[in-house]
């Protein structure tokens, strides 16, 4: 009987040790980087660069090419997303829209339009929580719930890009979301544009879009911003004049795969 107890105890200890070995840190990290200067790519630092690379996340495109990738966070609708879509259609630019459950449920017609016009719909979670406070099952539920609602509208099940709510994440969150098949997309260009009661005018948004531009830039823009909606047309026009081209996150992923060494 004693030997059976010993074996059981040993098994429990081994299982516990394996679980500890597999555990990863869950301390919250706020995404950030040293902002672009003189149109050079920004740098998130050695530690962050190493962490996100480990889990196939990214915040830059090909920094050797004057390419820009436009991404938008859609937590709720403030009346400006249609104008943003009009501008993208005019310039034949494909955007990636990271949507919450609230946005999808509240604005099915805009989700349908995004899909019909060839844009990418990314996942911004259902309730916009700090994912570091959630269990693995809760994280999956947050993301699956968005996908299910989008599928009801578009009939598509290709929502594989994720942007962590509030830009807060951890190694644990990166690990779990990668396990679920997501690629986490951060950003290299951003500014304070989400305060709807403190909009600063078209010039403010335009200046940031131009000043922070750099090769391989991934822009984060909030569609609740009147400033962004008013500045986007001129910004795209003038960035093209500066030699920039606009590509989609799908284009970037295809190029990354093409650059991988063959086995």
Swiss-Prot record:
Q: What residues sit in the active site? A: 73, 222
Query: InterPro entries per the record?
Result: Glyco_hydro/deAcase_b/a-brl (IPR011330), NODB_dom (IPR002509), Polysacc_deacetylase_ArnD (IPR050248), Spore_PdaA (IPR014235)
For site (Raises pKa of active site His), what residue positions does UniProt give?
Answer: 193
* Biological processes, Gene Ontology terms: carbohydrate metabolic process; cell wall organization; sporulation resulting in formation of a cellular spore
Which EC class does it fall in?
hydrolase
User: NodB homology domain: from which residue to which, for each copy?
Assistant: 66-247
Q: Where is the signal peptide?
A: 1-23
Keywords attached to this entry = Cell wall biogenesis/degradation, Hydrolase, Metal-binding, Signal, Sporulation
What induces this one? Expression is sigma G-dependent.
The knockout note for this entry states:
Spores have no muramic delta-lactam structure in the cortex and cannot germinate. Mutant spore peptidoglycan possesses many MurNAc residues lacking peptide side chains.
UniProt xrefs under SUPFAM superfamilies: Glycoside hydrolase/deacetylase (SSF88713)
Q: Which residues bind a divalent metal cation?
A: 124, 128
The UniProt record lists the keyword Signal:
yes
Presence of keyword Nucleus: no
Q: What is the pH-activity profile?
A: Optimum pH is 7.0.
Which Enzyme Commission number(s) are listed? Answer: 3.5.1.-
Q: Which domain of life is it from?
A: Bacteria
Q: What else is known?
A: CwlD and PdaA are necessary and sufficient for muramic delta-lactam production in B.subtilis spore peptidoglycan.
Q: Which PANTHER family match?
A: GLYCOSYL TRANSFERASE-RELATED, PEPTIDOGLYCAN-N-ACETYLMURAMIC ACID DEACETYLASE PDAA
Q: Function, please?
A: Catalyzes the deacetylation of N-acetylmuramic acid (MurNAc) residues in glycan strands of peptidoglycan, leading to the formation of muramic delta-lactam residues in spore cortex, after transpeptidation of deacetylated muramic acid residues. PdaA probably carries out both deacetylation and lactam ring formation and requires the product of CwlD activity on peptidoglycan as a substrate. Is required for germination. Cannot use chitin oligomer (hexa-N-acetylchitohexaose) as a substrate.
What is the protein name given in its UniProt record? Answer: Peptidoglycan-N-acetylmuramic acid deacetylase PdaA
What is the originating organism of this protein?
A: Bacillus subtilis (strain 168)
């Amino acid at each position: 009987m004693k030997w059976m107890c010993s074996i059981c105890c040993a098994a429990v200890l081994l299982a516990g040790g394996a679980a500890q070995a597999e555990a990863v840190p869950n301390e919250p990290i706020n995404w950030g980087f040293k902002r672009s200067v003189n149109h050079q790519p920004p740098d998130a630092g050695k530690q962050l660069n190493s962490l996100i690379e480990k889990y196939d996340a990214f915040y830059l495109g090909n920094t050797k090419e004057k390419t820009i990738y436009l991404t938008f966070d859609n937590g709720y609708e403030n009346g400006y997303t249609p104008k943003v879509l009009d501008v993208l259609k005019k310039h034949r630019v494909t955007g990636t829209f990271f949507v919450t459950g609230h946005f999808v449920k509240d604005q099915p017609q805009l989700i349908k339009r995004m899909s019909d016009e060839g844009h990418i719909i990314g996942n911004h979670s259902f309730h916009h929580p700090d994912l570091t406070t959630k269990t693995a099952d809760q994280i999956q539920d947050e993301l699956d719930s968005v996908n299910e609602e989008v599928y009801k509208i578009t009939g598509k099940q290709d929502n594989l890009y994720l942007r962590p709510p509030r830009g807060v994440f951890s190694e644990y969150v990166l690990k779990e979301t990668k396990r679920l098949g997501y690629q986490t997309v951060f950003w290299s260009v951003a500014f304070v544009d989400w305060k709807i009661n403190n909009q600063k005018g078209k010039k403010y948004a335009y200046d940031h879009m131009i000043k922070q531009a750099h090769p391989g830039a991934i822009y984060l823009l909030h569609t609740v911003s009147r400033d962004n909606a008013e500045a986007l047309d001129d910004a795209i026009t003038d960035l093209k004049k500066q030699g920039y081209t606009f590509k989609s996150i799908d284009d970037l992923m295809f190029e990354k795969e093409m650059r991988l060494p063959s086995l």
